[in-house]
């Protein structure tokens, strides 16, 4: 059963990969829709491959994505029939819903909260690629700026005082989505660079958190993985998350970059709260403090703080 489950995961990941590539590279609207559907069905298997998790997030995700698919299909048919206005409205609404961006974003935290670590990680990373790319193509620049500013604000404020790591990560993804959308407005290379760094950060963070739930695994590995991923998500120098933001900042000439920066600064609050409440506690094993690990962490934080000060002067 375990081998069968792992095989199903690999097959589903392959289907998701093919679907995303088809959707992004297709020049026809039908190809975009078909790619998104392949991606959806592949991901549904990942969400609950062996039936051990609650079916609620899987059902909710299916309903949301199916609604988006129907709206998108109706919009595409309307565009083919030369009903441009209604077609664009339906297509945009469906893409916004499937992307989980403002104003149809409220379903994301509730689905993430009860999903597995793997499903949550993929939902916050890979599942965003095709819808965001298509959204950047059909939305006018000013409308896209409204989405970017709204996502940065909602993610920063919504993540405050959250007790669930997954929910916190969902709101954090809203802030990072604003950065990715801003990068998409200028260059696909910038988007790919930021997305790669963000995906690596989420992968490390969720991997460390999943290890914390397994008593057979040591605390040092989980602390190192989650701590490294968290620092990258925070955008602290000299980690890659900081460099990715600098790349978008240098390439973007839009004033909405201010909203993205403010969203990232505010989101530091709940990142730091999690850092001290979980990562520092994981360094204590049966009331025995691992002094070397703590001192290494303190030294690392001081070095990064000094680097941040130097960067601010530069």
From Swiss-Prot:
Membrane topology: Multi-pass membrane protein
Documented EC number(s): 7.1.1.2
RNA-binding is among the record's keywords: no
Catalytic activity entry: a ubiquinone + NADH + 5 H(+)(in) = a ubiquinol + NAD(+) + 4 H(+)(out)
Highest taxon of the lineage: Eukaryota
UniProt GO MF annotations: NADH dehydrogenase (ubiquinone) activity
Pfam families: Proton_antipo_M (PF00361)
GO cellular component, as recorded: mitochondrial inner membrane
Subcellular location, principal: mitochondrion
Enzyme class: translocase
Annotated TM spans: 13-35, 61-80, 85-107, 117-139, 144-166, 189-209, 224-244, 246-266, 294-314
Keywords: Electron transport, Membrane, Mitochondrion, Mitochondrion inner membrane, NAD, Respiratory chain, Translocase, Transmembrane, Transmembrane helix, Transport, Ubiquinone
Gene Ontology BP terms: mitochondrial electron transport, NADH to ubiquinone
Protein location: Mitochondrion inner membrane
Family to which the UniProt record says this protein belongs: Belongs to the complex I subunit 2 family.
Function: Core subunit of the mitochondrial membrane respiratory chain NADH dehydrogenase (Complex I) that is believed to belong to the minimal assembly required for catalysis. Complex I functions in the transfer of electrons from NADH to the respiratory chain. The immediate electron acceptor for the enzyme is believed to be ubiquinone.
Name listed for the protein in its UniProt record: NADH-ubiquinone oxidoreductase chain 2
Source species: Mytilus edulis
